[in-house]
């Protein structure tokens, strides 16, 4: 075993690993943002449900203020739902990019594994040839001594 294994495409593998790590970070950020928007939407909907009940003890001014607040909440809910849709699309897109990056890295990883297995097989073959030669020389020496 004379040489150490060196993968010829190691720089490409490193590049693919960095790309995958970057895609993971982008995906996690997109997922975090989507979850934040979902929580915001849930809070707005809860607030809308809480204030949408009509109280007969309220004055006309209070009812008008409540009506304006509910309209504001409703428009904010609509805006937040649109933002949630765009965030869900972003999550789908970043997930697809992440899967592509993982596949690309795995392809190069498989190439490395196959190359390393071939290297080890060749090293073992060379070592076996050397062992056979040593055994042959030892046998010839023993035959010569007799």
Task: Give the residues covered by each predicted segment.
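Charge-rich amphipathic alpha-helical interaction elements
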Residues: 1-146
